[in-house]
């Protein structure tokens, strides 16, 4: 079934870039890119329209966050409806920086995911453990709790791509070994099988994030339960094309 799950590579630009930098990214995103890989880039919200208008049409564009309602007195927030109005179809939610820098709890993230799906967006919910949680053998406890919070608000699993990102590996240069990453992905898939359905477990893409690079992507892509990547800093550089083509 792994071969039936389309390989997925997302780029999370975080709070980086300006129009000139985006133009540079667009120039190398013309590829060639593996046609069997779905590609989405997550850009700062002020550049959603610019990126969508200039990025090749075969590449999706995602917001990096949104709120849980369509409109209202929520200064500084954007809604799924606004993201769609900019011509974009995707949103990244629950990234570890939203959880750990901005203090977003599991329940809020779940509500955001639910509203985004209701509004018609496709969603990349992020989960993952911190270093102290891994070192105290709590990885499964943490990621399963994060998944349990998400499930009640997921109305359409076909529009969900789960991103497992161990927090200790994000931007640190440390990467989970292919064996470590595959182990967590396999356990997450079994959790879906046990707590949602076998069909959802087999069809849902679970991607890996955490210092993915041109140097390690091919080994990570060979594993049975890693269905792609969510890439941070490397998505701003031409190496991103190598990562997209990891299974080429």
Curated annotation (Swiss-Prot):
One of its GO terms (molecular function) is methylglyoxal synthase activity. It is found in: Cytoplasm. CDD domains: TIM. PROSITE patterns: TIM_1 (PS00171), TIM_2 (PS51440). Pathway: Carbohydrate biosynthesis; gluconeogenesis; Carbohydrate degradation; glycolysis; D-glyceraldehyde 3-phosphate from glycerone phosphate: step 1/1. Substrate binds at residues 12, 14. One of its GO terms (biological process) is glycerol catabolic process. Expressed in skeletal muscle (at protein level). Triosephosphate isomerase is an extremely efficient metabolic enzyme that catalyzes the interconversion between dihydroxyacetone phosphate (DHAP) and D-glyceraldehyde-3-phosphate (G3P) in glycolysis and gluconeogenesis. Homodimer. This is Triosephosphate isomerase. The lineage of its organism: Eukaryota, Metazoa, Ecdysozoa, Arthropoda, Crustacea.
């Amino acid at each position: 079934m792994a071969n039936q799950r389309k390989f997925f590579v997302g780029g999370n630009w975080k709070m980086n870039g300006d129009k000139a930098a985006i133009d540079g990214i667009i120039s190398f995103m013309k590829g060639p890119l593996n046609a069997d890989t779905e590609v989405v880039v997550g850009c700062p919200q002020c550049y959603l329209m610019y990126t969508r208008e200039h990025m090749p049409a075969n590449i999706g564009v995602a917001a990096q966050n949104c709120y849980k309602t369509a409109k209202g007195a929520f200064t500084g927030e954007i809604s799924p409806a606004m993201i769609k109005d900019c011509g974009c179809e995707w949103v990244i939610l629950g990234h570890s920086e939203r959880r750990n820098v901005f203090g977003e709890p599991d329940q809020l993230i779940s509500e955001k995911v639910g509203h985004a799906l209701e509004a018609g967006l496709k969603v990349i919910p992020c989960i993952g453990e911190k270093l102290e949680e891994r070192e105290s053998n709590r990885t499964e406890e943490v990621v399963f709790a994060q998944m349990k919070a998400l499930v009640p608000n997921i109305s359409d699993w076909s529009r969900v791509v789960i991103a497992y990102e161990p927090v200790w590996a994000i931007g640190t240069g440390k990467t989970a070994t292919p064996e470590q990453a595959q182990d967590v992905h396999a356990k997450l898939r079994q959790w879906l099988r046990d707590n949602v359905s076998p069909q959802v477990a087999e069809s849902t893409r679970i991607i890996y994030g955490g210092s993915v690079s041109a140097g390690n992507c091919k080994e990570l892509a060979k594993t049975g339960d890693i269905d792609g990547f969510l890439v941070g800093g490397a998505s701003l550089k031409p190496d991103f094309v190598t990562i997209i083509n990891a299974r080429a």
